[in-house]
Design a protein with these regions (language model features):
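Extreme N-terminal basic, low-complexity initiation segments
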Residues: 2-7
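Glycine-rich phosphate/dinucleotide-binding loop and adjoining beta-alpha-beta core of small-molecule
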Residues: 9-14, 22-25, 65-74, 79-173
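Positively charged, low-complexity intrinsically disordered leader regions
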Residues: 11-66
Length: 174
């Protein structure tokens, strides 16, 4: 891993052209290495979570057709779920009809804090799994880079059903 400096700060570079970072694609292993390097330099998890969530919500808001009928964030137990909760908060604050669904107990304190705040500001927490036949945008924040557990058949069926019904209304974040 190498780094460069610019007027906007220090950037980590692996083996890609930094001149086209908007279209950058990295593997899970590369992203884990980037995050590891960032954290070793002192980047707080909280700051990265905010940066990621705000960036994703901005991307979604720029594509209004995705959210014209509203959105649901599927929240996982770890920091990926926290990223999703930041996205939910930002979309809610922008006036999007948003709800969340948490099929697993939350395991990370930071994710729990974002969940608690989402509840305080009035974001709806669905008690039951969402309808995969709806025209709502699904933002999947269930599984992160460190995913090691087997994904349940129920979750797989639900995501596959949404993908089949409206593939343009399902995005995964991490």
């Amino acid at each position: 891993v190498a780094s460069i400096h610019s007027g906007f700060g220090r950037f980590l570079i692996l083996n890609w052209p930094h001149t086209d970072s908007e279209h950058l694609m990295v593997s899970s292993e590369q992203m884990q290495n980037i995050e590891k390097e960032m954290f070793s330099m002192g980047m707080p998890v909280e700051a990265l979570m905010e940066k990621v969530g705000i960036g994703i919500s901005s991307w979604i808001l720029d594509r209004h057709g995705l959210i014209e009928n509203g959105a649901i964030v599927l929240v996982g137990p770890g920091h990926n779920g926290g990223d999703g909760l930041v996205v939910a908060r930002e979309l809610y604050m922008a006036g999007v009809d948003i709800s969340i669904w948490c099929p697993f107990p939350l395991k990370k304190q930071l994710t729990q804090k974002h969940f608690d705040y989402a509840m305080q500001i009035g974001i709806e927490n669905l008690e039951r799994k969402p309808d995969s036949n709806s025209d709502l945008l699904w933002i999947e924040a269930l599984f992160g880079l460190g995913q090691s557990r087997i994904i349940s058949d129920e979750i797989l069926r639900l995501l596959n059903s949404k993908k089949t019904f409206s593939p343009d209304k399902l995005i995964s974040i991490d």
